[in-house]
C-alpha cells in the first residue's frame, strides 16, 4: 500500500502522477460512484453501483440503469422534469 494523506483520500492511490487537475476530476467521479444513493422503490439509502451504468438496491433487489458514475445523469433529470410538467399540464 502506498502512503495516503487525509487530503488526497480516494485518489491517494495515484500519488503524484497525472497532475493535480486530473486527480481532482477523478476524485469527483470516484466519490460519486462509491456513494450510496436513495432507492425510489423501498425508500432507503442502499443503491450502489454494480457495473458501469447499472445500479442495484441491496435491500429490495431492484436494478436500475443510470449514468456511469452517478445514478442520475443531467439529461435524465431534465427529461423527468419535462415529463412531470407535461403531465401536470394535461391533468389541469
From Swiss-Prot:
Provide the GO MF annotations for this entry.
Answer: structural constituent of ribosome; zinc ion binding
Stretches annotated zinc finger (C4-type): 39-60
Instruction: List keywords of the entry alphabetically.
Output: Metal-binding, Ribonucleoprotein, Ribosomal protein, Zinc, Zinc-finger
Which Pfam family would be a valid example here?
Ribosomal_L37ae
Name the GO terms of the biological process aspect: translation
Give Gene Ontology CC terms. cytosol; cytosolic large ribosomal subunit
Report the Gene3D superfamilies cross-referenced here.
Answer: 2.20.25.30
InterPro entries (UniProt xref): Ribosomal_eL37/eL43, Ribosomal_eL43, Ribosomal_zn-bd
Q: Does the keyword Zinc apply?
A: yes
Keyword Endoplasmic reticulum in the entry? The reply is no
Protein family membership? Belongs to the eukaryotic ribosomal protein eL43 family.
HAMAP family reported for this sequence: Ribosomal_eL43
From the Swiss-Prot or TrEMBL record, give the protein name.
Large ribosomal subunit protein eL43z
Which species is the source of this protein?
Answer: Arabidopsis thaliana
